[in-house]
A protein has these predicted regions:
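N-terminal cap/lid segment of alpha/beta-hydrolase-fold proteins
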Residues: 26-69
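Short beta-strand element of the alpha/beta-hydrolase
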Residues: 68-81
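Gly/Ser-rich "nucleophile elbow"/oxyanion-hole loop immediately N-terminal to the catalytic nucleophile
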Residues: 69, 130-152, 164
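Short amphipathic alpha-helix adjacent to the substrate-entry channel of hydrolases
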Residues: 88-113
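Alpha/beta-hydrolase active-site loop
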Residues: 98, 119-137
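Short glycine-enriched nucleophile-adjacent loop
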Residues: 155-166
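The feature captures the conserved acid-bearing segment of alpha/beta-hydrolase catalytic domains
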Residues: 172, 178-244
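C-terminal catalytic histidine-bearing segment of alpha/beta-hydrolase fold enzymes
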Residues: 235, 242-286
């Protein structure tokens, strides 16, 4: 029985991968804002340099940004390794249309947007945060006003960091069709096996009694997610978040699919994306 469940889950994620690969040219966020085509992009900024490798990030700035003052930023947080990203969509996520267009939407809304490459997602996220803190002046980013965007199997890494009591970097986060991995989640072994195949990091949530309680979350759940067990992972998380008084807003997109922000161009999708932008503006005090 367990083998059948694993095969079904693997097949479902295979369908996600095929869907992404077949629609790479169409993977653009379903919201067009004025100025998106004129945002300023600084590519391939090294944020880690070691004897073995150099990891880079791209920073998107609003159109006509004068580089005279610091602005709030939103980081696209990744949980797939570079190899996993290429396996899933054929290229690094920072170069994938869904994320380049998200970064343009974010920048056109008045923020800086950051997307980066990663070999070790958990450690590299910490290195990225340290780099931004140390270089906020040169980057023209207000390190006191940083938000996050993360979706799908990227979200365990994001949530592990954001809910950690030591987090002083992220001030809010938008989580789209995510996976919430408590230590007692009954499908952990299945997710772990899947993560080894798909090359994403199944980070565990911290112990709920230690969750950071001043980082608002915007959670967007979809009713037609064909990735199994996302419903169970969310309901378990919501119960604990309420008990621990973690601030969150839940949007249940009843007819939404996994990847709706790039693959479902309709008014409801557009409204959810606009709500996400307003969420960042409010919590980052833009």
């Amino acid at each position: 029985m367990k083998t059948c469940k694993l095969m079904f889950l693997t097949f479902s994620l295979f369908l996600v991968t095929v869907c992404f690969q077949k629609t790479i040219g169409q993977s653009i966020v379903a919201l067009k804002l004025p100025g998106m085509d004129n945002v300023i992009v600084k590519k391939d900024i090294p944020y880690i340099k070691t004897s073995d490798s150099t990891l880079k990030m791209d920073v998107y700035y609003p159109p006509n940004f004068d580089f005279k003052s610091k602005i709030p930023a939103v980081v696209c947080v990744f949980g797939y390794t570079n190899k996993g990203q290429i396996k899933a969509v054929g290229k690094q996520l920072r170069k994938f249309g869904q994320y380049t267009s998200w970064c343009k939407v974010i920048a056109a809304s008045g923020f800086a947007a950051i997307a980066y490459e990663t070999i070790n997602p958990e450690n590299d996220l910490i290195s990225l945060m340290n780099y931004i803190n140390a270089n906020s002046g040169n980057l023209y980013i207000d390190a006191r006003r940083i938000g996050a965007y993360s979706c799908s199997a990227n979200t365990p890494v994001a949530l592990e960091n954001i809910l950690n009591s030591s987090n002083s970097f992220f001030k809010c986060a938008a989580i789209y069709y995510g996976i919430f991995l408590d230590k007692d989640f009954k499908y952990l072994s299945t997710i772990d096996t899947l993560s080894r195949n798909m090359l994403f990091i199944p980070s565990r949530l911290p112990e709920s009694t230690t969750w950071k309680k001043d980082v608002p979350l915007l959670i967007v759940h979809v009713g037609k997610d064909f990735v199994p067990h996302t419903d169970e992972s969310l309901t378990g998380f919501i119960d604990k978040a309420i008990n621990q008084k973690v601030p969150f807003t839940l949007i249940h997109y009843a007819t939404g699919i996994h990847g709706f922000d790039a693959y479902t161009d309709n008014e409801e999708t557009g409204q959810i994306i606009r709500t996400t932008i307003e969420f960042w503006k409010y919590n980052l005090k833009q």
